Amino acid sequence: MGMPNQQEDAPGRRWSVEDVLALPNDGNRYETVDGELLVSPSPRYLHQAVVGAVYAALRAWVVAEGIGVVLFAPARVILDAHALVQPDVFVLPPVGADVMSGAVPAPAPLLVVEVLSPGNARHDRLRKRPRYQRAGIECWLVDAESQLVERWATDSDRPEVCMDQRAWYPDRASSPFTMELAPVWKEVGLPTVG
């Protein structure tokens, strides 16, 4: 199957995980949420730099706490038969070699982090974020241009907005993960706001 055309992506078509997995590796990110096909272009450098900074901070803490494994896109998360997503950064609980090799499905992530950019902000905010919440997954939306992080708890209809420090309190951890935001923005070359 080639890149989706208008007929394949006709209104009312319900995309499955299998449909998305059959799409080509052409530089676009293909996901489906509740059967809707989401296509995002390759990300900008700023997006990837922020992803890298968040990944590095989370990974160091998760490894030290021994609570799981941190992965990043294009790794896939399958939530159900009509929901395949590629979160920018996500934390899985401890998994074995069978999950890491793909022999068995991965459990739901403990945390998902999506970095907003012009090509994906609408999908991340309006499609993926509510889907994560319905699956019981905490979601952070990182807005580098506004230099803030929105924390969406699984049972919340409004985010907790943080501009200085973001914290995460997973059940299995002996202490919370905290990430100062100013060093992240500085690392990726953004001027200080406020």
What is each of the regions a protein language model found here?
Residues 1-194:
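Gly/Pro/Ser/Thr-rich low-complexity, intrinsically disordered segments predominantly at protein N-termini
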